[in-house]
């Protein structure tokens, strides 16, 4: 992290799955130390199967250290449930969870609805304002990694100077195009 920030200061930072509480704390410390900007945290904690991917101590480190340095946090529905302690069944629940996380961590929160069975609508809470980003479920077996791809695209747009809302809109359009074209976004499960 020091090598990157002291060589070419990044215009955005995207953090994905980090399974160690010690690493999470060190990353948060370094992001603060270097006064990083446009930090997107995709708290990868739950596999598509529903299996937990990181230990509870790492979840606690995310809550206590990393989420508070983020400008945008992008949990999916199961991750939003873990981070809020709420059940998310519908649009109102998504809004409530996004608002709760945004207040608690002082950042924008995008709850990704891709785990919903009906649609792929995402709910953003930024500065107390709710914005919905609508998306259709696209029949494509290559959907592993779509959340990571979305958060990476958002980070790239932020680096180019786009607002959070514009970054999300552009990134959803990009991801939808990739899925429609059958682009293989990953094969791991």
At which residue positions do the language-model features occur?
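Nucleotide and nucleotide-moiety/phosphate-recognizing core
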Residues: 22-32, 107, 129, 165-166
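Short, charged, surface-exposed loops that flank catalytic or proteolytic processing sites
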Residues: 87-94, 159-169
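Charged C-terminal helix
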Residues: 165-189
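Conserved N-terminal subdomain of the carbohydrate kinase-like
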Residues: 1-52
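Conserved phosphate/ATP/ADP-binding segment of small-molecule kinases
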Residues: 56-130
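Glycine/charged-rich beta-loop-alpha catalytic/anionic-binding loops adjacent to active sites
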Residues: 128-139
């Amino acid at each position: 992290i020091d090598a990157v920030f002291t060589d070419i200061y990044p215009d955005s930072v995207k953090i994905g799955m980090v399974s160690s509480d010690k690493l999470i704390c060190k990353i948060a410390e370094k992001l603060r130390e270097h006064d990083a900007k446009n930090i997107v945290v995709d708290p990868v904690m739950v596999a598509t199967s529903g299996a937990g991917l990181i230990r509870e101590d790492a979840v606690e480190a995310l809550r206590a250290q990393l989420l508070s340095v983020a400008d945008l946090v992008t949990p999916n529905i199961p991750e939003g449930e873990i981070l809020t302690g709420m059940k998310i069944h519908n649009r109102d629940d998504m809004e409530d969870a996004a608002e709760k996380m945004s207040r608690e961590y002082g950042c924008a929160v995008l709850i990704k609805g891709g785990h919903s069975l009906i649609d792929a609508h995402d709910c953003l809470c930024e500065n107390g304002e709710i914005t919905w980003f609508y998306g259709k479920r696209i029949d494509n077996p290559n959907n592993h990694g779509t959340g990571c791809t979305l958060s990476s695209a958002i980070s790239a747009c932020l680096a180019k100077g786009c607002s959070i809302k514009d970054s999300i809109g552009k990134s959803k359009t990009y991801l939808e195009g990739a899925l429609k074209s059958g682009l293989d976004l990953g094969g791991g499960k």
